[in-house]
């Protein structure tokens, strides 16, 4: 009887673990520097240069207005960091989406890369 209870408890626990596992874990290329990030906001084309981060303010204005840029938050060890990334024209990215990010230092003038959408907000 005791053994049956242990087996049933283990089966229930195993079933619950599947409910809380994030499906995007394990699909990011961590080994080569990619991170799992959340899109926080989109930089609009009409935003004044004084309100842009350094890497976007340094771009020629026509390059800034013809491309889409987003602010992304990602975790690096225990710290939450922010990055500015250009949205590839082939991807439809919205605020709240989870993406694969290749971080870069915006203060040094570098813009991060987004390679794919891992999950869409609301799904």
Give the label of every model feature segment:
Residues 1-8:
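Bacterial N-terminal signal peptides that target proteins for export
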Residues 27-41:
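Short coil-to-beta-strand transition motifs
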Residues 42-49:
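Short, conserved beta-turn/loop elements at beta-strand boundaries and strand-helix junctions
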Residues 20-27:
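Bacterial lipoprotein signal-peptidase II cleavage site
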Residues 41, 55-123:
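Intrinsically disordered, glycine/charged-rich N-terminal periplasmic/extracytoplasmic linker segments
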Residues 15-18:
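C-terminal motif of bacterial Sec signal peptides marking the signal peptidase cleavage site
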